[in-house]
Design a protein with these regions (language model features):
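Outer-membrane beta-barrel translocator domains and adjoining extracellular loop/strand segments
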Residues: 269-271, 424-427, 454-460, 509-516, ...
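Repeated loop/turn-to-beta-strand initiation elements of outer-membrane beta-barrel proteins
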Residues: 402-410, 436-441, 493-499, 506-508, ...
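Residues on the lipid-exposed face of transmembrane beta-strands in outer-membrane beta-barrel proteins
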Residues: 392-398, 427-431, 485-489, 499-501, ...
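Gly/Pro-enriched, hydrophobic low-complexity segments
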Residues: 190, 195-296
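C-terminal outer-membrane beta-barrel translocator/porin domains of Gram-negative envelope proteins
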Residues: 440-446, 450-458, 468-473, 537-539, ...
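Structured extracytoplasmic
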Residues: 57-197, 205-211, 275-383, 474, ...
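Residues that define the transmembrane beta-barrel architecture of outer-membrane proteins
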Residues: 388-392, 421-425, 479-483, 520-528, ...
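Transmembrane beta-strand segments that form the barrel wall of outer-membrane beta-barrel proteins
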Residues: 226-232, 260, 371-384, 395, ...
Length: 718
């Protein structure tokens, strides 16, 4: 009876809370039951205790997670963050294996051919904390055992500037386990520790490159995280990251110290790195431009002395430095200039590095100017689309900041289509005179774009009694070059206005047929253009656009009159967990045109000849649409929808799911002349290696085409 008496007391106590009710008469009845029922009753009581304990543990875990998720909100309302700080970073590199393929990896060219396999770098940096929670790191002083060669491995800087309370932990890709939206992707367990501290263990619910495994030391009362240990693998980098957060106030939201160990594996290449960085240091050096290879200055700011191993790595560089400082001239001797190895210093070092690596150079006072050139010959910049086949892109861009509200930018974007044997380019020059109001003047030229005009071919047929010989002479294709110049100004975040002009010169690829019927083979137009932009929710919401363009015949010697209207609306709706819904709807039409001499060429409905990766024109475009349909109809109505998610379908599958970074679903619809309607469905994935899309089209109720599109994504974020 002792057991039953205990449970009677328990039942009475619990009945006060209205959760568990037992009657004394029921218990006496159970005593008289057979032994097997008695055992069942005991088992139920034990399960009851286990369930209550499990619910209690889950409730505690949820309470701790809630405090962690809401901790930044409590801190940010108390104090504004310091916008500028200083940091010391030390990095070491150990090249276990390397081959020629390492040269194709951005910023790894020097490691591929410099003699030593061990390197050490140090830097003193100015850190600017941006309003969006990101960091901007500007190097003030640097010291490297590799001398003038670049070894900084800039892709690793993203791992050293983690934003643990944001949705994405590292470079807008790795999902943070300390954000509420990502809770569904992680499993959490709590381990009690001394005082009010506890350890929070986390691991992903699925094996994916966007998720991490690790533990954090958390204050149970406030939810403040003091230290973090995590491991993961992203972009072929296996990493182990240790983070010590700041102690008080806003600094507790950012790292105080980070230690990173990583391993990069790529087709037989094996590079190990180790980084340490200390934030929130005082300003030690004066305002000087970036200084390189200054041992004395680095010794002044180094927070801790070098280890014996690090001194050994530096020893060769120190030896060369001291030998350079010695006075080698003598009164009775003539200095002999050292021999220059032309193959190594010119072909290998200077030309080779610039071919395989991107060039990024700052210039001017306070690094106000910058120039960046993509690798000239890098197969990783090759892409493929059903309409253009294989094509290669390159990009050159530079700019200069006059002030916080004024700058100027120049860009050259080019590409070559191997199927079309066609080179296209676009060169815009943009001067921002009022950045706060998006005020700028833009002037750009473009060439190499192909456009079609079937009406002129029809006129040739009529003039020659429907002779079909013209069909095989490719007379309907023209090479379109244009120059536009316009000014833009946003009066408010909701309303903007744009005015300028557009000049087109369209030249027939085959001029013979036009000469036979005394028709010009070159068509030019000069059109004033006006645009109005309306953003009902400001810059963060949708954008609605209305455009009016009118070309006047014989204006500046032109011969192609037309009047064109276009209306367009675009919006990318951000959803939870880095998901998004991209929407675009629009229409356009011609209201005034000549009989045959005009060209159907819309600004917001045209074939793209310079695509560039997953984030450029992979949404809001028609992948399988025939080129001729862009230029046949004097009107169009379009709608494009794209849903993007990191974990949609394939990400949940074994093996292959680990490499999936993004997935997309496409739905596009179009109504033009001869296509009523045109529908296109698609599905695409993005991995560290490739972005691959499969598309299917339907025109006028019949299945038309099926095709693929892919592009190399390898090292695109480096």
């Amino acid at each position: 009876m002792a057991f039953f008496q205990t449970n009677i007391i328990f039942a009475r106590d619990r009945s006060k809370n209205g959760k568990i009710l037992f009657s004394i008469s029921s218990l006496f009845y159970l005593v008289q039951m057979k032994n097997q029922y008695f055992k069942i009753f005991i088992l139920l009581i034990i399960c009851q205790y286990g369930l209550l304990g499990s619910l209690s543990a889950k409730s505690k875990k949820d309470s701790i997670l809630t405090r962690i998720f809401t901790y930044p909100e409590k801190i940010k309302t108390l104090q504004a963050p310091d916008t500028v700080s200083y940091a010391y970073m030390k990095s070491s590199f150990h090249i276990n294996k390397r081959n020629l393929l390492l040269m194709a990896v951005p910023t790894m060219y020097a490691m591929a051919h410099v003699g030593s396999r061990r390197y050490l770098e140090e830097s003193y940096n100015k850190v600017t904390f941006l309003p969006n929670g990101k960091y901007q790191i500007d190097k003030i002083l640097s010291l490297s055992s590799a001398g003038s060669h670049r070894l900084s491995f800039p892709a690793m800087l993203h791992y050293l500037t983690p934003n643990i309370y944001d949705v994405t932990l590292i470079n807008e890709n790795v999902l943070s386990p300390f954000h509420r939206q990502n809770k569904i992707y992680y499993k959490y367990t709590i381990e009690e520790s001394a005082d009010s501290l506890l350890k929070l263990h986390f691991k992903p619910r699925l094996k994916n490159t966007l998720l991490v495994t690790g533990e954090a030391e958390v204050d149970a009362r406030s939810g403040k995280i003091s230290t973090i240990q995590l491991t993961g693998e992203y972009d072929m980098i296996f990493y182990r990251l240790s983070i010590q957060m700041g102690n008080h106030g806003v600094q507790s939201l950012t790292p105080q110290n980070c230690s990173l160990t990583s391993r990069f594996l790529f087709f037989g290449n094996d590079v190990r790195t180790h980084y340490t960085i200390a934030y929130h240091l005082p300003k030690i050096l004066p305002n000087i431009s970036e200084a390189n290879q200054n041992f004395q200055l680095m010794e002044q700011i180094r927070p801790e002395p070098l280890t014996s191993y690090e001194k050994m790595v530096y020893s060769e560089l120190l030896k060369d430095k001291r030998s350079e400082e010695k006075d080698t001239t003598a009164l009775d001797s003539v200095a002999t200039p050292p021999k220059v190895n032309f193959v190594k210093s010119v072909l290998w070092d200077m030309i080779g590095e610039n071919i395989f690596n991107d060039i990024h150079q700052d210039f001017g006072p306070n690094k106000a100017g910058s120039l960046r050139i993509d690798p000239i010959l890098n197969p990783l910049y090759m892409e493929y689309s059903p309409s253009q086949g294989f094509y290669y892109n390159f990009n050159i861009r530079g700019g200069y900041h006059f002030s916080e509200n004024s700058n100027i930018w120049l860009q050259l974007k080019g590409g070559y289509s191997f199927r079309l044997h066609q080179f296209s380019f676009w060169i815009p020059l943009i001067y921002y005179f009022d950045i706060r109001h998006n005020g700028f003047i833009s002037s750009g030229i473009s060439g190499g774009r192909r456009i079609q005009n079937g009406n002129l071919v029809n006129e040739l047929r009529i003039a020659t009694n429907n002779n079909r010989v013209w069909d095989n002479l490719n007379l309907y294709e023209f090479n379109d070059s244009f120059w536009d110049c316009y000014a833009n100004y946003d009066f408010t975040p909701k309303i903007g206005f744009q005015a300028g002009f557009v000049f087109h010169r369209r030249t027939a690829l085959n001029k013979v047929g036009f000469e036979l019927i005394n028709k010009p083979s070159v068509y030019t137009s000069l059109a004033p253009k006006f645009q109005v932009h309306y953003r009902p929710w400001g810059y963060q919401g949708p954008t609605l656009m209305a455009c009016y363009e009118k070309s006047i015949k014989k204006l500046a010697g032109t011969n192609t009159p037309y009047t064109r209207w276009e209306f367009d609306g675009q919006y990318i709706l951000p959803l939870h967990n880095v998901q998004s819904l991209s929407m675009r709807v629009g229409t356009g039409f011609y209201t005034d045109r000549s009989h045959n001499d005009y060209f159907v060429d819309f600004e917001n409905f045209r074939q793209t000849f310079l695509p560039n990766g997953w984030n450029d024109e992979w949404s809001g475009e028609f992948e399988l649409l025939e080129s001729s349909l862009y230029n046949q109809s004097n009107y169009y109505v379009r709608a494009n929808f794209t849903y993007e998610s990191p974990f949609l379908v394939l990400a949940w599958t074994p093996l292959i799911g680990h490499f999936i970074e993004r997935e997309r679903l496409y739905l596009s619809a179009l109504r033009v002349k001869n296509a009523n309607p045109y529908l296109e469905l698609g599905y695409a994935i993005k991995t560290r290696f490739l972005s691959i899309g499969a598309f299917m089209s339907n025109m006028n109720g019949k299945t038309k085409d099926f095709g693929f599109k892919f592009g190399f994504e390898l090292f695109r974020r480096w």
